[in-house]
Amino acid sequence: MTNIRKTHPLMKILNDTFIDLPTPSNISSWWNFGSLLALCLIMQILTGLFLAMHYTPDTSTAFSSVAHICRDVNYGWFIRYLHANGASMFFICLYAHIGRGLYYGSYMFQETWNIGVLLLLTVMATAFVGYVLPWGQMSFWGATVITNLLSAIPYIGTTLVEWIWGGFSVDKATLTRFFAFHFILPFIITALAAVHLLFLHETGSNNPTGIPSNMDMIPFHPYYTIKDILGALLLILTLLALTLFTPDLLGDPDNYTPANPLSTPAHIKPEWYFLFAYAILRSIPNKLGGVLALLLSILILIFIPMLQTSKQRSMMFRPFSQLLFWTLIADLLTLTWIGGQPVEHPYIIVGQLASILYFLLILVLMPTAGLIENKLLKW
């Protein structure tokens, strides 16, 4: 008799996705991040659900409801910090996953890649609206500053901002709708992730060499399930260490002060995972120019498959491209650091140079390196 997992309509889908899936035999630990992202998403939805049971999306009670969760709800402090630091782990996995895709040429699966970029934008939107909910100083002013950027759009900007706010400033209506968005978006992310996986399984996974691996495939289970479990344990260990020992390491102290529209914090800045984009935004003195640069810093990922000049897919055997890739990583770390610094000399010029280098590397230097490597190999 055929095994039920191969015949049952639902089990068959799960079987073809996680059990009998033919997988390249040589994929490294950089391929672990997909499953880690799934784990992060599940964890964020569960902790978020329990937080939503005690949170009130109202300007007069939001801050105190978060304090109530931390003080009076059983293990409320733990759930709250798991959720906050879980977001950081989510972005660490997300950036590692994108970095892997860039390095090994996984972006040549264009549908999978484009859904991935859409997923990145949705996760960023979710994190942004979620950051507003505790209604601390940085929540309020972060929301005010970032939503205000839309006013740079010619003609309709101001109307658009007031429409998003639901009034003439960030207020009760804004908080309520941001809570609604923050609740619904993770489910949209889940649906998009399923589509992402669907497109990936149309082509099969890439591998470190970038060479088709049809001739050497192994079943996903048990080889990669056990590998994913190891990755998951390391992720959980890191998250627990962060949550239990230094829960506020990545947060902002200003968020322990209730939101006050009459007092602006000295340095308004977003969470660490948005600092690179924030630095690019600030490095351009013009408001509209800054907004466009901010958008392009993320949307540039869509154009990467079109900028592929090398005849080799992966960077595994391309030393020039590797050097430029790691320069890009160093540049992003520099931008992240600059985004958290005040707007003064020498940070302004460093941020501007790092922003120029970011676009130069992706749009000019990396495609040129690909052409040079082709030439050196007489291809």
Curated annotation (Swiss-Prot):
It comes from the Eukaryota. PROSITE patterns: CYTB_CTER, CYTB_NTER. The gene is MT-CYB. One of its GO terms (molecular function) is ubiquinol-cytochrome-c reductase activity. This is Cytochrome b. It comes from Delphinus capensis (Long-beaked common dolphin). Belongs to the cytochrome b family. The chain crosses the membrane at residues 33-53, 77-98, 113-133, 178-198, 226-246, 288-308, 320-340, 347-367. GO terms for biological process: mitochondrial electron transport, ubiquinol to cytochrome c. It is found in: Mitochondrion inner membrane. Its cofactor is heme b. It is a multi-pass membrane protein.
